[in-house]
Amino acid sequence: MNENLFASFTTPTMMGLPIVILIIMSPSIMFPSPNRLINNRLISIQQWLLQLTSKQMMSTHNNKGQTWTLMLMSLILFIGSTNLLGLLPHSFTPTTQLSMNLGMAIPLWAGTVLTGFRHKTKASLAHFLPQGTPTFLIPMLVIIETISLFIQPVALAVRLTANITAGHLLMHLIGGATLALMNISPTTSFITFITLVLLTILEFAVALIQAYVFTLLVSLYLHDNT
């Protein structure tokens, strides 16, 4: 293939015009507003999935944590739909950009931490020093716990970026191998194509799982601070 290995991460264009507008409008088409809701199978499945996800994530939260339900549901829908749209051929996946993922992770993490310091100041400070710590280990543990706290948003963003990027690069490599082997060995090319199809199905699952994992970890951080 003559394309650059990272060509799938560039902004797509159609007739010289960026098609970002169509990508941005796609979630509103996939998830219609309440005044357009019709009782059909698709809407019923969407509502059932949202209720199941919100119940699983927010059932252990108190009243302060429950106020984050709408934000977390919007977050999982945004990341999930963005990841799925990125699987379309010649499309751009914003979640492969670490800057965007950090832009989501840092404010959400900071919100949970500030909520904890505001409503549970003593409990939040107590996390920096486990109970029963020997006196000579106190300075070291405080530093370690502080570093582990500040690395949480970085871990959130890097996890999402790495998983989505790795999957796209692997699909690109296998797709290139399939085309290269068509004239050399059709049988091997067919086997590689089957592998590509299976990997594509796996990537659909990974796209949804990573959206769920990202939102679930934010929910867990919120639970620890409320």
Swiss-Prot record:
Keyword Repeat: no
InterPro entries: ATP_synth_F0_asu (IPR000568), ATP_synth_F0_asu_AS (IPR023011), ATP_synth_F0_asu_bact/mt (IPR045083), F0_ATP_A_sf (IPR035908)
CDD domains: ATP-synt_Fo_a_6
This protein's record includes keyword Disulfide bond: no
Spans traversing the lipid bilayer: 5-25, 68-88, 97-117, 136-156, 164-184, 189-209
Name of one Pfam family that matches: ATP-synt_A
Top-level taxon of origin: Eukaryota
Catalytic activity: H(+)(in) = H(+)(out)
Function, as annotated: Subunit a, of the mitochondrial membrane ATP synthase complex (F(1)F(0) ATP synthase or Complex V) that produces ATP from ADP in the presence of a proton gradient across the membrane which is generated by electron transport complexes of the respiratory chain. ATP synthase complex consist of a soluble F(1) head domain - the catalytic core - and a membrane F(1) domain - the membrane proton channel. These two domains are linked by a central stalk rotating inside the F(1) region and a stationary peripheral stalk.
Subunit structure: Component of the ATP synthase complex composed at least of ATP5F1A/subunit alpha, ATP5F1B/subunit beta, ATP5MC1/subunit c (homooctomer), MT-ATP6/subunit a, MT-ATP8/subunit 8, ATP5ME/subunit e, ATP5MF/subunit f, ATP5MG/subunit g, ATP5MK/subunit k, ATP5MJ/subunit j, ATP5F1C/subunit gamma, ATP5F1D/subunit delta, ATP5F1E/subunit epsilon, ATP5PF/subunit F6, ATP5PB/subunit b, ATP5PD/subunit d, ATP5PO/subunit OSCP.
Descriptive protein name: ATP synthase F(0) complex subunit a
Organism encoding this protein: Rhinoceros unicornis (Greater Indian rhinoceros)
